[in-house]
Amino acid sequence: KSYFLGGAGERGLTIEGNFIKFTAIGVYLEDIAVASLAAKWKGKSSEELLETLDFYRDIISGPFEKLIRGSKIRELSGPEYSRKVMENCVAHLKSVGTYGDAEAEAMQKFAEAFKPVNFPPGASVFYRQSPDGILGLSFSPDTSIPEKEAALIENKAVSSAVLETMIGEHAVSPDLKRCLAARLPALLNEGAFKIGN
C-alpha cells in the first residue's frame, strides 16, 4: 500500500502555565483516500473544512487505511503514554454509547502492548487502522516503520476512537486538525481532477 501525509501536529500539556510538547503526530492516508474524500469535499476551502466535524469523521471512518505516527519529543514510558490515550478513548466511547465488554477487553490488550515499552526522545508508536476495524500497533526506536507489529486489536470502535481523540470533536491536537484542513483541499482538487480524466 502507498500512503501520503495528510497532516501533522503536536500534542502536549499545559503545566504551570507553559505548554510542554510531548508528541509529534503524523497522519498518513492510503492513496485511495483522495478519491474517497474528494467525492464530498472537493472544492471546499481550508476554513470550511476546519469548521466541519463531518470532514474529520469521514477521514476517521473512510474505507481506506490510516497510519498514525506518534514520535516522542520527551521521554515517556509506554504505560504513561498509553494511560492518557486510553483515558481519552474510553471517555469518547462512553460518550457515544459504544463502550461495552468487547471494548474494555480491547483496551486491556492495548495497555498490555505498551507495558514493556519505553519511549526515549525520537522513538515512535505506529497505529495502523484498517477499514475492517483492525488496529495494528508497532514501536520503533526512531521514525522508521517496524517490519513486525507488536499487537493487533480487532475492535472497530476502539480503532476509530484512537484517531477520533486526535482530530475529532475534542481533539488533543488542534494543530493536526488545522494541518489536515490546510493540506487536503489542494490534494482533493488535484486528485479528483486526475481521477476524473
From Swiss-Prot:
The biological processes this protein is annotated with in GO are: flavonoid biosynthetic process
Q: Specify which residues bind substrate according to the UniProt entry for this protein.
A: 23, 88, 165
Pathway(s) per entry = Secondary metabolite biosynthesis; flavonoid biosynthesis
Q: Which UniProt keywords are listed? A: Flavonoid biosynthesis, Isomerase
The site annotation (Important for catalytic activity) covers 81
Q: What is this protein called?
A: Chalcone--flavanone isomerase 2
The record's section on InterPro entries has: CFI (IPR044164), Chalcone_isomerase (IPR016087), Chalcone_isomerase_3-sand (IPR016088), Chalcone_isomerase_bundle_sf (IPR016089), Chalcone_isomerase_sf (IPR036298)
GO molecular-function term, one example from the UniProt record: chalcone isomerase activity
Q: Is-annotated flag, keyword Transit peptide?
A: no
Other remarks on this protein = Part of the biosynthetic pathway for all classes of flavonoids, a large class of secondary plant metabolites, many of which are brightly colored.
Reaction(s) this enzyme catalyzes, per UniProt: a chalcone = a flavanone
Q: What is its EC number?
A: 5.5.1.6
Q: Which PANTHER family match?
A: CHALCONE--FLAVANONE ISOMERASE 1A (PTHR28039:SF10), CHALCONE--FLAVONONE ISOMERASE 1-RELATED (PTHR28039)
Name the gene. CHI2
| Top-level taxonomic group | Eukaryota
Job description of the protein: Catalyzes the intramolecular cyclization of bicyclic chalcones into tricyclic (S)-flavanones. Responsible for the isomerization of 4,2',4',6'-tetrahydroxychalcone (also termed chalcone) into naringenin.
Q: Which family does it belong to?
A: Belongs to the chalcone isomerase family.
